[in-house]
């Protein structure tokens, strides 16, 4: 199962988050305080092809807000963590970064034809993606 440490790694580690994160409560506090923009950049570097990063970033946080602020709002930080969590879970299931990325960007029939990366932008969508990925843990087709 994916641990918070794997999520923290995709957020850029303690340096990317801007504070030490030794527990899930520390990660929650960092999200509520607002993650630095670099945390989103780290997630996108892993999860998105270079040509798609700016578009996905602008779906997480409006372009003007991203350029104006050094820290994300708690709401945008939560979305960033959600993307990192889903990406970390895909990485854990496939044990291969390229295959994990391919899963995130390919429309999936169990997500009503949506791409997992798009579904993960909302809390309920992320839960759906996690359910699909959980099937892979049990050897079912993903």
Where are these regions (language model features)?
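Non-transmembrane "mature" sequence context
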Residues: 1-142
């Amino acid at each position: 199962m994916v641990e918070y440490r794997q999520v923290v790694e995709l957020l850029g580690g303690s340096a990317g988050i801007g504070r030490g994160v030794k527990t899930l409560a520390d990660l929650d506090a960092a999200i509520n305080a607002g993650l630095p923009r670099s945390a989103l950049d780290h997630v996108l570097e892993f999860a998105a092809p270079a040509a798609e990063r700016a578009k996905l970033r602008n779906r997480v946080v409006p372009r003007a807000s991203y350029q104006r602020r050094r820290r994300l709002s708690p709401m945008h930080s939560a979305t960033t963590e959600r993307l990192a969590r889903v990406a970390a879970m895909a990485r854990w299931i496939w044990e291969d970064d390229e295959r994990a990325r391919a899963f995130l960007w390919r429309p999936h029939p169990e997500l009503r034809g949506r791409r997992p990366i798009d579904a993960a932008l909302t809390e309920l969508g992320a839960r759906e993606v996690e359910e699909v990925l959980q099937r892979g843990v049990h050897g079912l087709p993903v």
